[in-house]
Amino acid sequence: METFDYYEILEITRTSDKETIKKAYRKMALKYHPDRNPDDKDAEEQFKRVNEAYEVLSDDSKRQIYDKYGKEGLQNSGFSGFSGRDFSDIFGDLGSIFESAFGANFGFSTQKRGGGKYNLDEIVGLELSFTEAVFGCKKEIHNSFKIACSDCKGTGAKGGKLNTCKDCGGKGQVYMRQGFMTFAQTCPTCKGEGQSASEKCSKCKGSGFEISEESFEVSIPEGIDDGNRIRIGGRGNADKNGSRGDLYIAVSVAEDENFVRDGENVYIEVPVFFTSIVLGTTLKIPSLRGELELKIPPNTRDKEQFVFDNEGIKDVNSAYRGKFVAQIKITYPPKLNAEQRALTEKLQESFGIESEPYKNVFEECFTKVKQWLHKHSKNDKDTTK
């Protein structure tokens, strides 16, 4: 993985929120997009970097690992940089940009399922604790959903009487010209229905729906992650015939105080005192399912990672279980008392020249510098003769 900083690529700070990250991504993606920079290899490479940066910083778990452990942590979690999506996938991420510039019918719009005044599919949010998401649970869902107004039968018009929209002639779309091109837009008067009410329904105030409520229990699968959605068929809004769409539960998972999640992998930072690093030690560390024994060999490096296979989180769609990764953080005493200082000095003296490794390096460097100066001084003297 190349050594460039994701925040610098998007020209943002490390404290930037998601909205700022998204705006920066759109700006930089448009700037370096291949369609705007044909045959420009540098722009193409920068475009890949922009997407790689956004792929990490827009994902809470990846961003948390990147901020805490750097790219090495991401590599150990299986992230290998730009995912290699083709540019049609990228256009999907940038759809809202093109829609605002060219209108909703440029190929990125979504159609309202059901053809009525409201969408039959509905989305609700559900917050889970870290433990609930990792091990699964059951949750009571309180759902408010739309049903067609009993007075106007879902039309929003008094007595259900609708007239053909005068602005679009019943087509639901109006057309506009930009230069030599013509674009279609949803009719702002009838909102794409092709019909409009001369007088609003007094019961639903023209909305075409009433609100009904229900409660039911949902089984949350083991391993579900933040940002995942659960589809519940037949629990969405109802059309005028009583047929219901689907309910999508958007899952939000709280962060844990000790564990950091990235997909099916889990990270924990293990503080180890410097003397234990020098001597080596064995520790009991907390894991998702109890304790693990961590053997730390002498002279382990700071931020070195120890991987426990099959101790992570179960994949929500398979039997695969991720890794549990323990990362070492070497700690030092903030200050020494007189006795500790004397012991430390005595220990350093006992190592002799080994305790001053810089001397050999510097002496070799000094020798090279002196030789270089002597050589050039001699050449200068020969030149002046």
Swiss-Prot record:
Annotated residues for binding of Zn(2+) 2: 165, 168, 187, 190
Co-factor binding comment: Binds 2 Zn(2+) ions per monomer.
Stored InterPro entries: DnaJ (IPR012724), DnaJ_C (IPR002939), DnaJ_domain (IPR001623), DnaJ_domain_CS (IPR018253), HSP40/DnaJ_pept-bd (IPR008971), HSP_DnaJ_Cys-rich_dom (IPR001305), HSP_DnaJ_Cys-rich_dom_sf (IPR036410), J_dom_sf (IPR036869)
Protein's cellular compartments: Cytoplasm
Main location class: cytoplasm
GO cellular component: cytoplasm
GO molecular function: ATP binding; heat shock protein binding; unfolded protein binding; zinc ion binding
Pfam families attached to this UniProt entry: DnaJ, DnaJ_C, DnaJ_CXXCXGXG
UniProt domain comment: The J domain is necessary and sufficient to stimulate DnaK ATPase activity. Zinc center 1 plays an important role in the autonomous, DnaK-independent chaperone activity of DnaJ. Zinc center 2 is essential for interaction with DnaK and for DnaJ activity.
Primary role: Participates actively in the response to hyperosmotic and heat shock by preventing the aggregation of stress-denatured proteins and by disaggregating proteins, also in an autonomous, DnaK-independent fashion. Unfolded proteins bind initially to DnaJ; upon interaction with the DnaJ-bound protein, DnaK hydrolyzes its bound ATP, resulting in the formation of a stable complex. GrpE releases ADP from DnaK; ATP binding to DnaK triggers the release of the substrate protein, thus completing the reaction cycle.
Subunit composition and interactions: Homodimer.
Classification via HAMAP family: DnaJ
Official protein name in the record: Chaperone protein DnaJ
Organism expressing this protein natively: Helicobacter hepaticus (strain ATCC 51449 / 3B1)
Gene transcribed to yield this protein: dnaJ
